[in-house]
Amino acid sequence: MNILQEPIDFLKKDELKNIDLSQMDKKERYKIWKRIPKCELHCHLDLCFSADFFLSCVRKYNLQPNLSDEEVLDYYLFAKGGKSLGEFVEKAIRVADIFQDYEMIEDLAKHAVFNKYKEGVVLMEFRYSPTFVAFKHNLDIELIHQAIVKGIKEVVELLDHKIDVTLLCIGDTGHRAADIKASADFCLKHKADFVGFDHGGHEVDLKPYKEIFDYVKEGGMHLTVHAGEDVTLPNLNTLYSAIQVLKVERIGHGIRVSESQELIDMVKENNILLEVCPISNVLLKNAKSFDTHPIRKLYDAGVKVSVSSDDPGMFLTNINDDYEKLYTHLHFTLEDFMKMNEWALEKSFIGCDIKEKIKKLYF
């Protein structure tokens, strides 16, 4: 890994008024997106990789030997989109084929942190599911966690803490090894490394799991859950339960809040931030198009939103692609993006000392 990189000249607020994006081509705009000091709150570490990294793993373990590189990417990944969140989850389970040993998992963590640094991310909250990483090859979740923490720390230190990284633990439903209570226990056992707890997999009403979420919250964890993402669900119960029953501080995706003025008012009254992932929403058919993505309505209504990449390995994207889509389709400005990142910093679960450092440096 080539750690040596030119330092990023991050934008300051007083520079924004002098930048005219309308006079720039796409390549020039991407240079600007990179210079935005980004605080990313919603990215699955276990699905954060480049095409080259993924293909190297597939070839190393001799997976799908009869497929070309392009066919491998089509078989495993979701870069061309699909029919639904359910189809995406099934493909993500295929990707778990590559989680075969702890060295690979450590390399994945290093790769993910370094790529986020190159994208101009200054605060990164990664989340991962111990049971998801472990289940295909019966790995030990303790050794998985050690590998991830070691990989993250090594790159953060090599980069002289120019990016700060923390972890959230996901408790899954939806695959054969899913055990949300065991994940909650694991999260609290490693509270020195985790700052929050999430639910992943198929979107479900989490009211029956209230005791588990209360348990991790009482143990010192912050709460965010995936809710209001899946448009195939017949109602908005997942959102109501997240807000009223689990009393979360943030919501992963949450774009269906836009369907209810009552929910818009509730998230504002409770100071809940929505971790919005625009490209993910469109590729999974949870938003009809970028032009009609609900983030515009939510932002204009005064709801706190942030921009995240969700599963960049599955989509073969990076966070700057999301910024490009929001600019070209919904006309968000640099001032809007800076505000979203300030909100993300405010609502981050990382320690107050790091938040204060980032605020002084970039905002």
Curated annotation (Swiss-Prot):
Keywords recorded for this protein, A-Z: Hydrolase, Metal-binding, Purine salvage, Zinc
InterPro entries in UniProt: A/AMP_deam_AS, A_deaminase_dom, Ado/ade_deaminase, Metal_Hydrolase
Region called Gating helix loop, residue ranges: 170-184
Enzyme Commission (EC) number: 3.5.4.4, 3.5.4.31
One GO cellular component, as annotated: external side of plasma membrane
Cofactor(s) named in the record: Zn(2+)
Enzyme kind, highest EC tier: hydrolase
Catalytic activity reported: adenosine + H2O + H(+) = inosine + NH4(+); S-methyl-5'-thioadenosine + H2O + H(+) = S-methyl-5'-thioinosine + NH4(+)
Binding site for a purine D-ribonucleoside: 44-46, 172, 201, 229, 253, 310
Notes on activation and inhibition: Inhibited by coformycin and methylthiocoformycin (MT-coformycin).
Positions with a binding annotation for Zn(2+): 42, 44, 226, 310
Pathway where it operates: Purine metabolism; purine nucleoside salvage
Range of residues in the leader sequence: none
UniProt cofactor note: Binds 1 zinc ion per subunit.
Annotated site (Important for substrate specificity for S-methyl-5'-thioadenosine): 172
GO biological process: adenosine catabolic process; hypoxanthine salvage; inosine biosynthetic process; negative regulation of adenosine receptor signaling pathway; purine ribonucleoside monophosphate biosynthetic process; purine ribonucleoside salvage
Gene3D superfamilies xref list: Metal-dependent hydrolases
GO molecular function: 5'-methylthioadenosine deaminase activity; adenosine deaminase activity; metal ion binding
A matching Pfam family: A_deaminase
Family indicated by similarity: Belongs to the metallo-dependent hydrolases superfamily. Adenosine and AMP deaminases family.
Protein's job: Catalyzes the hydrolytic deamination of adenosine to produce inosine. Unlike mammalian adenosine deaminases, also catalyzes the deamination of 5'-methylthioadenosine (MTA), a by-product of polyamine biosynthesis, to produce 5'-methylthioinosine (MTI). Plays an essential role in the purine salvage pathway which allows the parasite to use host cell purines for the synthesis of nucleic acids.
Protein name, per record: Adenosine deaminase
Annotated source species: Plasmodium knowlesi
